[in-house]
Amino acid sequence: MSVRNIFADESHDIYTVRTHADGPDGELPLTAEMLINRPSGDLFGMTMNAGMGWSPDELDRDGILLLSTLGGLRGADGKPVALALHQGHYELDIQMKAAAEVIKANHALPYAVYVSDPCDGRTQGTTGMFDSLPYRNDASMVMRRLIRSLPDAKAVIGVASCDKGLPATMMALAAQHNIATVLVPGGATLPAKDGEDNGKVQTIGARFANGELSLQDARRAGCKACASSGGGCQFLGTAGTSQVVAEGLGLAIPHSALAPSGEPVWREIARASARAALNLSQKGITTREILTDKAIENAMTVHAAFGGSTNLLLHIPAIAHQAGCHIPTVDDWIRINKRVPRLVSVLPNGPVYHPTVNAFMAGGVPEVMLHLRSLGLLHEDVMTVTGSTLKENLDWWEHSERRQRFKQLLLDQEQINADEVIMSPQQAKARGLTSTITFPVGNIAPEGSVIKSTAIDPSMIDEQGIYYHKGVAKVYLSEKSAIYDIKHDKIKAGDILVIIGVGPSGTGMEETYQVTSALKHLSYGKHVSLITDARFSGVSTGACIGHVGPEALAGGPIGKLRTGDLIEIKIDCRELHGEVNFLGTRSDEQLPSQEEATAILNARPSHQDLLPDPELPDDTRLWAMLQAVSGGTWTGCIYDVNKIGAALRDFMNKN
């Protein structure tokens, strides 16, 4: 195409052009003291605010910063002018506007800035997944820089929904120790009537390839799953869990997580959150007073009670780090998961696969917290963004009209009793719900690993609560090669899949949801286990062991496994103990002792083809090095400036 063609459709209107304008009427509310003592940036900021059309006489009011992961471009009719990367951030402008209107009505000055986010669902199985986890640190850093760019802000309100943008936003808010901050969860997308949820629909390719879904059904299911244009996915994945954790931290107002996006209650949550931020600012209650060690432990407790995503093992420590709190250790997670029962029955864990909006209607986080309070598992004296303690919030919730009316709506509209979604501890135990997370160790994972043990298919667990699988390994150096074999009928019941080289150094610690989701929804999948140094989507279920340490590219034993090796997996889902061990090879006439097997594995070289993915971006390579120096996955893949600085100084001194 020539330059002439590019400009071929010019309108003659372009030649009607102004080169001057009158400028805003009125005067800035300046005083002699302001002109003498305030920096020029403050004064010029007022000039620009007037230029954008704000009433000049209102410009010396307290600034409240709205920070969002908004994406896409909505027309006046709500239809897309430009598509977003996911529906989770597509409607956030509605919540932003609702909050801004409250701020203005209360004689403060709202500002809005944006750092949009990617979609883990969109990037599954693509090189885009190499940027997924690293994005979180980068986005949080940009958000913190934006917040500091309005240095006189009296409060910051974060509005976010999904897998990486929401943790990044919470990290950014957690770092604002000396001002008020509030998180507005972006809610959940509505489930489709007679449609599949957003987790199951991501398996249409694998099910079609295995003859378990017709082409026509795949087309229909793929079109229908997202029944509304906003909110995070309908399951308790990383997005939904992060919303729940925000409430558990006291960083979001009560009963705000998992609200149905676009509905009146969802808008009101934004308005109420703005009122909360203004109240905190007026009372002088800062983030440092809300995000404490006790608040972090409450969030971990709520995570366990909901059966949350294993990705929060990466995000909660990162939030704690930014808040200046104790970073939870594996021992902390084990301690909490051993004492906290899972109480919530939603996708993907079950036993009944309710969409997360049903958990909101059943009372959401405060309802779960009432049960946890009855067990003495919460720190009720913590301060929250309401300006009241958690105890005061729960006392209000227990007797609120809101609680009763939403439960009744769930019964009237869906014929579902709220107690079937959020169970009492006694009912949960009777239904066979187990605690959420187990950390297996063994000669394959000497530094540990993670499994969402509560999500293993119950039919695969014996009467003592034990999942046991001894089988032959099939080793893959990429998720792509594993999913190829799944789609081409090369995986059979009883296999143990091992995907190596997909930890932080290999692929940015990508999610392997293509594999885990296929195993969940294929008829033979419950008889297949997975071991990997990658991580999992929050919607993953089954006998899937991830976060294996050390990772293969750091010389970990997992990188020394070969196809044909015999592996034993044992998970005690009640006592939360687990082992994952190399036993020998399929050709061994007599298996070696455990000690001998460990020595054999350790003596092997790593797989000869083990390398970082050739398409791994330099940005992600840098992230992998920085987070490794800072403590790695068990400290949340954070950037610890002191540790990074010490490592650089040590390197320079040696060279």
From Swiss-Prot:
Disruption phenotype: Disruption mutant has reduced ability to catabolize D-xylonic acid. YjhG-yagF double mutant cannot use D-xylonate as the sole source of carbon.
Gene name as annotated: yjhG
Record Gene3D superfamilies: IlvD/EDD C-terminal domain-like
Enzyme class: lyase
Temperature dependence: Optimum temperature is 30 degrees Celsius.
Stored SUPFAM superfamilies: IlvD/EDD N-terminal domain-like, LeuD/IlvD-like
Organism: Escherichia coli (strain K12)
Record field: pH dependence: Optimum pH is 8.0.
Keyword presence, NAD: no
Pfam families given in the database record: ILV_EDD_C (PF24877), ILVD_EDD_N (PF00920)
Keyword NAD: no
Protein name: D-xylonate dehydratase YjhG
Gene Ontology biological process terms in this record: aldonic acid catabolic process
Family of this protein: Belongs to the IlvD/Edd family.
GO molecular function, one term: xylonate dehydratase activity
Function summary: Catalyzes the dehydration of D-xylonic acid to form 2-dehydro-3-deoxy-D-pentonate.
This enzyme's EC code(s): 4.2.1.82
Domain of life: Bacteria
Activity regulation remarks: Activity is increased in the presence of Mn(+) and Mg(2+). Inhibited by thiol compounds.
Gene Ontology cellular-component annotations: cytosol
InterPro entries linked: Dehydratase_YjhG/YagF (IPR017798), Dihydro-acid_dehy_C (IPR042096), DiOHA_6PGluconate_deHydtase_CS (IPR020558), ILV_EDD_C (IPR056740), ILV_EDD_N (IPR000581), IlvD/EDD_N (IPR037237)
Catalysed conversion reaction: D-xylonate = 2-dehydro-3-deoxy-D-arabinonate + H2O
Signal peptide region: none
Protein keywords: Lyase
